[in-house]
């Protein structure tokens, strides 16, 4: 019975990673095979309003591997998979107001650094 729980957990983890990857490609960018480098790109939605808003987009380092048994024993909540990654984030930005009341961050520099969305 315990074997089936572990097997189900691995399947669910794999499925969630696949879904995360699938949803991280907006508007048909899934068809591109290579991943562009981390750099400034113009936001196409705000470009329609005539306002040049730039965002950091691109790929950085990411990998996942099985957690070593020795490390798993010391965890408060043992996890079977360990991941390491860096994300394309803004090194510098300027706060701008668009359409009178919408406040945005217009990125001016990008680099690969800690993934802030992973931190809770």
From Swiss-Prot:
GO biological process, one term: positive regulation of steroid biosynthetic process
Subcellular locations according to the entry: Secreted
Organism: Equus caballus (Horse)
The UniProt record lists the keyword Glycoprotein: yes
Residue stretches spanning the membrane: none
Lineage: Eukaryota, Metazoa, Chordata, Craniata, Vertebrata
Cysteines paired by S-S bonds: 35-59, 38-88, 56-110, 60-112, 87-115
Residues carrying a glycan: 80, 106
Family: Belongs to the glycoprotein hormones subunit alpha family.
Protein name in the entry: Glycoprotein hormones alpha chain
Signal sequence, start to end: 1-24
InterPro entries found in the cross-reference section: Cystine-knot_cytokine, Glyco_hormone
SUPFAM superfamilies: Cystine-knot cytokines (SSF57501)
GO cellular component terms attached to this protein's record: extracellular space; follicle-stimulating hormone complex
Organism domain of life: Eukaryota
The keyword Glycoprotein appears for this protein: yes
Quaternary data: Heterodimer. The active hormones thyrotropin, lutropin and follitropin are heterodimers composed of CGA, a common alpha chain described here and a unique beta chain which confers their biological specificity to the hormones: TSHB for thyrotropin, LHB for lutropin and FSHB for follitropin.
Alphabetized Pfam families for the sequence: Hormone_6
GO molecular function: follicle-stimulating hormone activity
Gene name of the record: CGA
Record keywords: Disulfide bond, Glycoprotein, Hormone, Secreted, Signal
Its biological purpose: Shared alpha chain of the active heterodimeric glycoprotein hormones thyrotropin/thyroid stimulating hormone/TSH, lutropin/luteinizing hormone/LH and follitropin/follicle stimulating hormone/FSH. These hormones bind specific receptors on target cells that in turn activate downstream signaling pathways.
